[in-house]
């Protein structure tokens, strides 16, 4: 499947505990169909102490399914993403709601 959501994209959460919140994608896991979004889906993990790292309870982002996030367009509203092939043969992402090219 083509990468409709990519690293650096601003997304909004559609369902779940963080519904309506926005954040920036800092990692995409295409094989699992998930992404990590900064400040979204925070969970507490027990960290074992090592020589380099202090032990204790840390808060970090957990993966969120790509079907539960939507790209936020320039107008600040969530939009679906499609693809368009330009005249020079380059494939670019396009916002379905406005038709604006996202990259390229």
Curated annotation (Swiss-Prot):
Coiled-coil ranges (or none): none
Key word RNA-binding present: yes
GO cellular component labels: ribonucleoprotein complex; ribosome
Gene3D superfamilies in alphabetical order: 2.30.30.30
GO molecular function: rRNA binding; structural constituent of ribosome
UniProt KW keywords: Ribonucleoprotein, Ribosomal protein, RNA-binding, rRNA-binding
One Pfam match: KOW
Record-level GO BP terms: translation
Family annotation (PROSITE patterns): RIBOSOMAL_L24
Record NCBIfam families: rplX_bact
Role played: One of two assembly initiator proteins, it binds directly to the 5'-end of the 23S rRNA, where it nucleates assembly of the 50S subunit.
Binding partners and assembly: Part of the 50S ribosomal subunit.
Family: Belongs to the universal ribosomal protein uL24 family.
Protein name in the entry: Large ribosomal subunit protein uL24
Gene: rplX
């Amino acid at each position: 499947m083509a990468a409709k959501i990519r690293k650096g994209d601003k997304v909004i959460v559609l369902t779940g505990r963080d519904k309506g919140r926005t954040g920036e994608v800092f990692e995409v896991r295409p094989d699992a169909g998930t992404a990590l979004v900064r400040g979204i889906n925070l969970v507490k993990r027990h960290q074992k102490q090592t020589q380099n790292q202090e032990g204790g309870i840390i808060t970090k982002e957990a993966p969120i399914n790509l079907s539960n996030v939507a790209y936020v367009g320039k107008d600040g509203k969530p939009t679906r993403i499609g693809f368009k092939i330009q005249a020079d043969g380059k494939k670019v992402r396009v916002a379905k709601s406005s038709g604006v090219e996202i990259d390229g």
